[in-house]
Amino acid sequence: MTPSLFPRRAALRPIALAASLALLPALALAQAAEPKDANDTLNLNRVVVTGTATSASKMKQSVSISTLEADQILKLSPTNAAEILRSIPGIRSESSGGEGNANLTVRGLPISAGGARYVQFQEDGLPILLFGDIAFGTADQFLRTDYNLSHLEVIRGGSASTLASNSPGGLVNFISKTGEEKGGAAGLTLGVDGGRQTRVDLDYGGSLGNGTRFHIGGFQRVGEGDRKTGFNAASGGQIKANITQDIGSGYLRLSLKALDDKTPSFLPVPVITTNGRIQSIAGVDPRTAFFINNSTPQDLVFGADGKMVSTNPRDGLRVKSTAIGLEGSFKLGDGWNITDKFRHSTNSGRFIALFPADNGTPVAGASKFTATLFNTSIDDLGNTVNDLKISKTFGNAAGGKATVTAGLFTAKQQVALTWFWNQYSVDMKGSGAGATFTTAGWDTWGGCCVRNYNVAYETTAPYAALTWEAGALTLDASVRNDKQKASGFYQEDNPIAKTWDPATRKNVNYQLSHTSYSLGGNYQLNKDLALFARASDGVAFSADRLLYGTPVDGSVPVASNGVKQIEGGAKLRAGAFSVFATLFSAETRESNYEATTQKFTSNKYRADGLELEVGYRAGDFKLTGGATYTNARITASNDASTVGKTPRRQADFVFQLAPTYAIGALELGAAVIGTGKAWGDDANTIVQPAFTVLNAFANYQFNDRLSLSASANNLTNTLGYTEVEGDGHAARAINGRSVKLGLKYNF
């Protein structure tokens, strides 16, 4: 069944909907999100709230932070959250997997098994999921960007380790509109090259009077997705809404979210690796290949309740999420402030994607390959989170001021999934491939992957921060104590009886704690130049990655993943030119389990580098960009042969350039994203070649309300590999060229 959050007529007749909306009377013009100072191309004057104890401008904060406005993001029609983040310096974001299950990290911290272990995804200051690397259940799966988005704040390193849990690498905060500006927009987007798709976006917000304001918006789409799949692989939508009541010097806010969506997932495809070089196989283009189609049979799997379930591989990544949030913030007088944020979310779904178990070898020119269908039920990834913060500001006779902050973060995250992976013989064809069932999940890969687990992770994290500001100097220190309690079970199957095996059921019952710290300072030499430095220590606790290995019943110590960082840099505005430069060094220790290789690892890493973010404006021409140089090494490992090697998929150099030029009512722009050569494995035997991707857009403004746009992702159809299996039989690449046309009406 096609998921739907809007009336069926809206899903089937988006053009009629857009046309009717265009006839609405003009209520207000949508105000473009431009900085007040047109030359402040990096928006260094924007006040940021993410991962900081006190609200202050980017120029005054002692952290590396980037911001993106909604209009910057929407112009290039990004296909997923990971693609948005590729434009942020210091972020390594692999956007090749579709609208979820992305791999992401910062500043040379490792991507050892997938997801975003060291980076927390947030919506409006609270985590979407408490852990960033849950197998088949990453935070970006439950995140969609649409017209509800106000702006994006991204912190690398810094105080992220003490002002949020499981985020020593950084924070990515998607901040919603709250009705402060009256108006809205309706948009229609059509996919015309690449995958066929139709999408309708709508939002509106404003004042209801008496200090009450609201915002509501969402999207509905149907189509193939970002590759030609031959069926409606992408179908669904989202609604978000909030209402705010201003009360004296504070406010109360209620927010709601409903997401019901399915999208295709893109996993590695069969390739051949010769002398460390990846080569595609005839008939299988890694940029476009998709082996699931209308002829793919239903997949019969074993459920958590012990019953067989018939599933449809064409559902791909199917997610459902509902959330309700409450937020309040008040100034109590005499320097006292209190803020509390609460959210309860239910998250569930199913992940289905085809992974090559081989590449058809040893027979040269093989017409078929063996595929494992990763079919994982996301039974429950719901959570309840609350962040309470109280602060007091003290002045002194010397004109300085100190702010003391105390907070308490609490969370309960459920992690309940069921795996059952059948195998198929699949035609070696990038489209229209036939698939024949061969092996039931009871026997796939030796029966390793019939799994069921249900674990509750409870986190209690008190934290405190002290900020002292005297003239041009700001100093801050913060500390956080994360305590995690895990309880539940995990079990495997009895392949003979074909049921869950009580003998394999293991209890989960352990506790962990870690105290993190962060010390920083910022000195503003003048209004256009500031220097900053910081040292921090943080932790990322693991969840399901610890199961099916060392006992987690409390009988032996449980490992955690730690990061120590130092950084220092400068922020400069010089006329039309702006630069944000940071030197960094990070040490990481981690333990890990990887589903595709069935291996446990224990490694230590070090990464040193330089991060640059620049901006320039000359009349109607604007350029923003960045570059990151990283020297990363494995410094210790349970596999001694990898010590001294470069961590897999870590390029020494990556860069981003985004020029735009306005010619009257026409605006032209591009995003050039490049990555240097990387190794595909920790042994450094397989090369992932360097590649550069060109995205482009054109936007024509007919009048103050109506605009027409065209955007292209991977305009030159570049082949760029983002990962390869350690034995070289399969690799994943970015999507090939896709082109979209959009019509937007502001009202």
Predicted regions located by residue number:
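N-terminal Sec signal peptide and the immediately downstream disordered periplasmic leader
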Residues: 1-87, 324, 605, 616, ...
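Extracytoplasmic beta-strand/coil segments of soluble accessory domains associated
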Residues: 82-127
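Short acidic/polar hinge/loop motifs at secondary-structure boundaries
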Residues: 127-156
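Gram-negative outer-membrane beta-barrel transporters
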Residues: 472, 576-589, 594, 600-683, ...
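Structural signature of Gram-negative outer-membrane beta-barrels, strongest in the C-terminal barrel
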Residues: 381, 399-413, 448-588, 607, ...
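Repeated loop/turn-to-beta-strand initiation elements of outer-membrane beta-barrel proteins
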Residues: 182, 211-214, 249-254, 336-338, ...
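Acidic/polar loop-and-plug regions of large Gram-negative outer-membrane beta-barrel proteins
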Residues: 244-246, 251-323, 350-376, 429-450, ...
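Short strand-turn segments of transmembrane beta-barrel domains in outer membranes
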Residues: 171-207, 217-229, 671
